[in-house]
Amino acid sequence: MNIHEYQAKALLKSYGAPVAEGVAIFSADEAEAAAKKLPGPLYVVKSQIHAGGRGKGKFKELGPDAKGGVRLAKSVDEVVANAKDMLGNTLVTKQTGPAGKQVNRLYIEDGADIDRELYLSILVDRSVGQVAFVVSTEGGMDIEAVAEHTPEKIVTVAIDPEKGVTAENLKTLADALKLEGEARADAEKLFPILYKAFVEKDMSLLEVNPLIVMTNGRMRVLDAKVSFDGNALFRHEDVVALRDTTEEDDKEIEASKYDLAYVALDGNIGCMVNGAGLAMATMDIIKLYGAEPANFLDVGGGASKEKVTQAFKIITADPAVKGILVNIFGGIMKCDVIAEGVLAAVKEVGLKVPLVVRLEGTNVELGKKIINESGLNVISADDLDDAAQKIVAAVKGA
């Protein structure tokens, strides 16, 4: 689960991290009062959407010469003018895709005099099975580009969960960022604070880009992105309360109600699979044969007939879907239950696109018999390769 920048900063501030004063607003009428609460005279007006690249983004409605989604303002009047310009319009960034995201809230923040911009993130490093800091002196820019062109400028430091952030870790991180004086002292206080927040709140990513050294020598969290482990949300009611469903795909929200793992993609072949690994393999083979998956959908290992029906409804709710591939390996889940769920869904939604079903495992012969004797226009496949070729051919021939 993702949250907005202003929410992430409030959370980090509660742990003691140095962040600027700021006020979130939801209408342009609130802009003047918000700005007057801040010291000034420099302000930053930030679009709040769940996507990166806001500063370089462009508003659809304002034309190519308009300013981006993060703007400096040197007076309260400029803050108000920018708020009117930005709220309600659609911001397109490299992460939103061409559709963009509507800006429904802004964060008005006190400006800072920046000397250096650094990069810091905390994530789970699965290669070593530990939480790790990733830092770079190249902050304020695309860290992926840094990793590609100058990987030597990125330093990763894994943290032993039994010891926490040690003095040795602090020295390594501060040295990697070339910090001295007050900035180094600030950083050595900040790193354990961020680690504590990451672990206690079950985050999956905490990214500060940039982490800045100001001209007065002090450090500040200038931007913050936080993602949480969805499997741990049951023990964090305060985090769940921060969820903004307007930033999420409607189909993903619906899927979460039925405990379905669904992610919308840009292709035209809908997929319903049990097991994340099999789902990824299914998407890979669809791409191998020249098509694109419309979604990732894992119905899990013990899905009921009703759950399968709901999964089918979610897939068919996407107008981009021109064909559907169901790929099920029945272990805990029985193939006859899947077959009945698929057929019930086909009848209920009045399916108008090609459907290929590949079943294997428990009660597979009974499952195939149910499908073959249904009288419905369902294409049966013997294996995954056969299934992928059949659905791609059916979609391209439609």
Curated annotation (Swiss-Prot):
Keywords: ATP-binding, Ligase, Magnesium, Metal-binding, Nucleotide-binding, Tricarboxylic acid cycle
Domain (ATP-grasp) ranges: 9-254
Listed pathway(s): Carbohydrate metabolism; tricarboxylic acid cycle; succinate from succinyl-CoA (ligase route): step 1/1
Cofactor requirements of the protein: Mg(2+)
Top EC class of this enzyme: ligase
Catalytic activity: succinate + ATP + CoA = succinyl-CoA + ADP + phosphate; GTP + succinate + CoA = succinyl-CoA + GDP + phosphate
Binding-site residues, ATP: 46, 53-55, 109, 112, 117
Gene Ontology CC annotations of this record: cytosol; succinate-CoA ligase complex
Residues holding Mg(2+): 209, 223
InterPro entries named in the record: ATP-grasp, ATP-grasp_succ-CoA_synth-type, ATP_grasp_subdomain_1, Succ-CoA_synthase_bsu_CS, SUCC_ACL_C, Succ_CoA_ligase-like_bsu, Succinyl-CoA_synth-like
Swiss-Prot/TrEMBL GO biological process terms: succinyl-CoA metabolic process; tricarboxylic acid cycle
Enzyme Commission number(s) from the entry: 6.2.1.5
Gene Ontology molecular function: ATP binding; magnesium ion binding; succinate-CoA ligase (ADP-forming) activity; succinate-CoA ligase (GDP-forming) activity
Residues that hold substrate according to the record: 274, 331-333
Superkingdom of origin: Bacteria
Cofactor: binding comment: Binds 1 Mg(2+) ion per subunit.
Summary of subunit composition and partner proteins: Heterotetramer of two alpha and two beta subunits.
Entry's family note: Belongs to the succinate/malate CoA ligase beta subunit family.
HAMAP family, per database record: Succ_CoA_beta
Protein name in the entry: Succinate--CoA ligase [ADP-forming] subunit beta
Species of the source: Rhizobium meliloti (strain 1021)
Lineage of producing organism: Bacteria, Pseudomonadati, Pseudomonadota, Alphaproteobacteria, Hyphomicrobiales
